[in-house]
């Protein structure tokens, strides 16, 4: 890694700004919403059988937009059954946004919310210290496994937190996405450190197979307009480049050869397509659903 390059996560406000821009320019949340509408009801169809309370755990839930859509599907499947929704999220800013969202949302009378301002590893340590293994009927980890130090250990721990008939839902970038192309080629030169791992759903599937876990995978088609990345001096384009490389102020700080190579490769068929004069990045995702033992 070039010594001048810093992880985007080291500048929280710039990370949040670039992440919001990513959501604005991509179909990330739309493709997740389509999955929740079309596939999630079947996935959760038996998690609450004979349960007086349904226990849900969100790990790295952000501001809760996707969480509340999934909660609505659980409510639709088991009307009136109390839902205990625990949230593990390290960002105070995101928790504040989540609480604001809950305050405005209708039809949450039977849902209790508990927020834990922790990383997933801090939550794991606390559970192990308390020696009281909580069991959950539904656990979801959406776009967060990049930020844990021990991915295999994290998978084993949260799988062990599943109640009988429980499901663990993981969403990550697909192994056939532009992200995978970018990370395989440039991961060694980008700020790969304690803050971020360059992993895809393909890596997770291999780990789950090595554990002997039962799981299914679903591919979600998603794209992102990155045209602004190629406009000189465009601030939004620079923020999107930061997000794509997980690097703070990439355009200014990256060595010229690395910057030029990545900008060139972002236009290549392995990363993007060109349509109506726009450069559209392959943001495909994979959903992995892990079964309880």
Swiss-Prot record:
Chain segments annotated as coiled-coil in the UniProt record: none
Top EC class, one word: transferase
Residue positions binding S-adenosyl-L-methionine: 60, 89, 94, 120, 142
GO cellular component entries: cytoplasm
Alphabetical list of Pfam families matching this protein: Methyltransf_23 (PF13489)
Binding residue positions for substrate: 28, 283
UniProt record, GO biological process: histamine catabolic process; methylation
Keyword Protease: no
Alphabetical UniProt keywords: Cytoplasm, Methyltransferase, S-adenosyl-L-methionine, Transferase
Catalysis performed (reactions): histamine + S-adenosyl-L-methionine = N(tau)-methylhistamine + S-adenosyl-L-homocysteine + H(+)
InterPro entries hit by this protein: HHMT-like, SAM-dependent_MTases_sf
Location of the protein in the cell: Cytoplasm
EC number(s) stated in the UniProt entry for this protein: 2.1.1.8
Keyword NAD: no
GO molecular function, one term: histamine N-methyltransferase activity
Annotated function: Inactivates histamine by N-methylation. Plays an important role in degrading histamine and in regulating the airway response to histamine.
Family classification: Belongs to the class I-like SAM-binding methyltransferase superfamily. HNMT family.
Protein name in the entry: Histamine N-methyltransferase A
Recorded name of the encoding gene: hnmt-a
């Amino acid at each position: 890694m070039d010594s001048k390059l810093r992880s985007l996560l080291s500048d929280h406000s710039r990370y949040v700004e670039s992440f919001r821009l990513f959501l604005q320019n991509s179909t990330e949340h739309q493709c997740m919403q389509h999955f929740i509408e079309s596939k999630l009801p079947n996935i959760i169809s038996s998690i609450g059988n004979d349960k007086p309370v349904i226990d849900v755990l969100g790990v790295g839930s952000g501001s809760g937009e996707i969480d509340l859509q999934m909660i609505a599907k659980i409510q639709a499947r088991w009307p009136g059954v109390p839902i205990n929704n625990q949230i593990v999220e390290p960002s105070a800013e995101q928790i504040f946004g989540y609480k604001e969202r809950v305050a405005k949302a209708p039809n949450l009378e039977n849902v209790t919310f508990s927020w834990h301002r922790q990383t997933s590893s801090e939550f794991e340590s606390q559970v192990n210290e308390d020696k009281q293994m909580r069991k959950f009927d539904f656990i979801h980890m959406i776009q967060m496994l990049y930020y844990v130090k021990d991915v295999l250990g994290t998978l084993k721990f949260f799988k062990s937190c599943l109640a009988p008939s429980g499901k663990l839902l993981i969403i990550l970038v697909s192994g056939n996405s532009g992200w995978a192309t970018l990370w395989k080629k440039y991961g060694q030169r980008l700020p790969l450190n304690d803050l971020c791992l360059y992993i895809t759903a393909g890596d997770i599937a291999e780990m789950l197979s090595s554990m002997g876990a039962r799981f299914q995978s679903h591919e979600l088609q998603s794209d992102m307009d990155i045209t602004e990345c190629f406009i000189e001096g465009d601030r939004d384009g620079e923020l999107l480049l930061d997000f794509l490389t997980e690097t703070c102020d990439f355009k200014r700080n990256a060595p010229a050869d690395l910057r030029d190579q990545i900008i060139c490769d972002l236009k290549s068929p392995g990363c993007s397509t060109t349509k109506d004069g726009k450069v559209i990045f392959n943001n495909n995702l994979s959903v992995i659903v892990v079964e309880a033992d």
